[in-house]
Amino acid sequence: AKMSGPLRGIHVNAWTTATDWTLRRARPALVKSLDWSPDWARAIREYDIRVFIIRKWADDDSSLVPSPAAAAERLWRRFAADFGRMQAALADTPATVYLETPWNEVHQETPDQLARLAEANVRFVELAHTAGWKALVGNFSVTWPLVDHFPAFVPALAVADGYSHHEYWMPGQLLPGEWTARAGLLYATLPADCPRPPVYVTECGIDNVAGTRPPNQYGWRSYPRPDAAYVVELDAFAASQPPSVAGLTVFNCGEVGTRWKSFELAESGPVADWLAAGPREWEDESGHEMPPAEEVPVSKT
């Protein structure tokens, strides 16, 4: 029987020997990468990567001034050459490729602020589509955006090819609806005629969500438990996802420095084998009818 549920994948900060180990052992169906190596074209074929998501690190320039649309255009100009090189490298690969909008975990406290971020996402997606890319919008942090505010993001969902956000939890505390499995709650707030594109959880795993330890330093390896215990939690996490979730990428592979060392997936046979055992294709059983996508022009450059 064909396996159901979201694709299982990895989040890659940098392509290191550690990343190589995980790619070889896990052969993940899904990869999100911040590393723009043209070698991804080879890896997609060699490891049978079905969906490839790529994002430019732009946390140093996330301001929406002088306007959201102008901010999107500024970031597009900044990275246009890299976008073009990567697009050329990936042109003949069999994977579905998404460009994720560059704003990372931007907290929007009010519906008006979220609407401004939606406006920026809309403009970025327009530029991506014109250049021949599919695009994901969102890239929100765990617990964000607030469920009641989510309808303000409708304009971005209406143009996007997918929606992304991050979900973390603490050992034994998935807290579905609060820390994890939020896509169903978010989508339930939307008008009936609003597009509900496939959801990708583009960062996930055990972390210090509750803030009881120093931030950003307590991944799954920080807890004195066997790797198999993490696999049990990853399994429960994947199984709890609503049918609109197409895939999830576990944080993290490849790190320069030590900040994210406790999240590193390399050298964990149990975790790699769990990734390898996941479905190779996602079947949309959400019941959300996506309107026919407009023909996306292919860039001639």
Identify the meaning behind each predicted range.
Residues 12-24, 71-91, 146-153, 231-238:
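Short, acidic/polar
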Residues 22, 48-52, 211-225, 230, ...:
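Aromatic-rich peripheral "rim/lid" segments of glycoside hydrolase catalytic domains that contact
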Residues 4-8, 26-30, 48-51, 94-99, ...:
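Loop/turn elements at helix/coil->beta-strand transitions in domains of secreted/extracellular proteins
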